[in-house]
Amino acid sequence: MKISIVIPVFNENESLPDLKVELDKNLSAYPEWEVIFIDDGSSDGSTEYLADLCAQDSHYKLIQFYRNYGKSAALSEGFKLADGDYIITMDADLQDDPAE
């Protein structure tokens, strides 16, 4: 069973390190998982943080928009790339608890 988590991101650079810690902690119990970040035209360093993360850990993938298309467009692109048996969406600002 593979889990895909699709997360749209727009200017969430401050939240991303904490989000990664929580995702790693909660997903480590599963043998197969991926996290797909869709950067929706961020200008605060989110794109660079996510690119570095994806280069270091193959569980993480990045789709980059060069301007803000909105949450629906971001989710749609994430769904196209997701190949898990289960697909979960969440926000990058930690309003959704990764443990849930």
Predicted feature locations:
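Structured catalytic core of nucleotide-sugar glycosyltransferases
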Residues: M1-E100
